[in-house]
């Protein structure tokens, strides 16, 4: 446990950001799974789900939650046959 006041504050802010990042990552993973499942079943709304997943991945990179290479890999996998 930190003794310095600023470090105690950092512990609290880190917990908040960790929870936020975890929620966003979970949302991204769920969107990717739904898009891949729809694509596999050849559903009519597959393109909408893929576009939504790609949008979330891009937002994750913009916020610094995902690394750019991982985002590119995920987007590539979504777009492939």
Swiss-Prot record:
UniProt xrefs under InterPro entries: Ribosomal_bS20, Ribosomal_bS20_sf
Any one GO molecular-function label of the UniProt entry: small ribosomal subunit rRNA binding
Region (Disordered): 1-20
Any one Gene Ontology BP term: translation
UniProt GO cellular component terms: small ribosomal subunit
Function (record text): Binds directly to 16S ribosomal RNA.
Annotated protein name in UniProt: Small ribosomal subunit protein bS20
Organism: Mesoplasma florum (strain ATCC 33453 / NBRC 100688 / NCTC 11704 / L1) (Acholeplasma florum)
Gene name as annotated: rpsT
